[in-house]
């Protein structure tokens, strides 16, 4: 059995990444969402074990000491991280796994797993990003300004380090682009070696 593929999706906060990721998981079979660990509090209808594993700072820092993360980062005073064992369990079963992580975490994963496929979600403009952050009503004005400043000074330029860039100005088009990337990556020759060899045997080859 061929190992599954690791996909990374990153974006400035408010670019629509989480909504696209949820839609992609529903559209594409054998694609598993990687549930990250975080020290932040749940928002809205979020549940532990579904959107995130919500843990306290002491638990998270102990996991760091024990090298249990394939990546982790501190963003706006909260930790976020991907557990190594969760990722390995999925890809060993031949399934693909999708990591919804920030640009710092993505850089760590690329160093440890050079064959990952990375996707950057770009907002259509600064003004649209600001409006989306305000409309979702999850942050106070000060936090929104911090997020916009971070996007403008740091995050938006990280697109250069990604394999694919999707501009999320139309949700349906962005969704179809993400789906197409995953399906195309599954058709790469190296990913299909086992199936190809099985077919060749039916033609009398070895």
What are these regions (language model features)?
Residues 25-34:
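Post-Walker A helix-loop "phosphate-sensing" segment adjacent to the P-loop in P-loop NTPases
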Residues 10-12:
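P-loop (Walker A) phosphate-binding loop of NTP-binding proteins
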């Amino acid at each position: 059995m061929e190992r599954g593929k690791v996909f990374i999706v990153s974006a400035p906060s408010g670019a629509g990444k989480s909504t696209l990721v949820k839609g992609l998981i529903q559209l594409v079979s054998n694609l598993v969402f990687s549930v990250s660990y975080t020290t932040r509090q749940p928002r809205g209808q979020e549940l532990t074990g579904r959107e995130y594993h919500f843990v306290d700072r002491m638990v998270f820092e102990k996991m760091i000491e024990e090298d249990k993360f394939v990546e982790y980062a501190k963003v706006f005073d909260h930790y976020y991280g991907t557990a190594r064992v969760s990722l390995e369990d999925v890809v060993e079963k031949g399934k693909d796994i999708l990591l919804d992580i920030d640009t710092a975490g993505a850089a760590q994963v690329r160093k440890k797993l050079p064959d990952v496929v990375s996707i950057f979600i770009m907002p259509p403009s600064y003004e649209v990003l600001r409006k989306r952050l305000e409309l979702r009503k999850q942050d106070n004005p000060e936090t929104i300004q911090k997020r916009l400043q971070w996007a403008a000074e740091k995050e938006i330029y990280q697109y250069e380090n990604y394999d694919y860039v999707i501009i999320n100005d139309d949700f349906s088009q962005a969704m179809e682009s993400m789906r197409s990337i995953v399906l195309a990556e599954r058709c790469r020759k190296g990913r299909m070696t086992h199936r190809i060899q099985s077919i060749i045997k039916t033609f009398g080859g070895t």
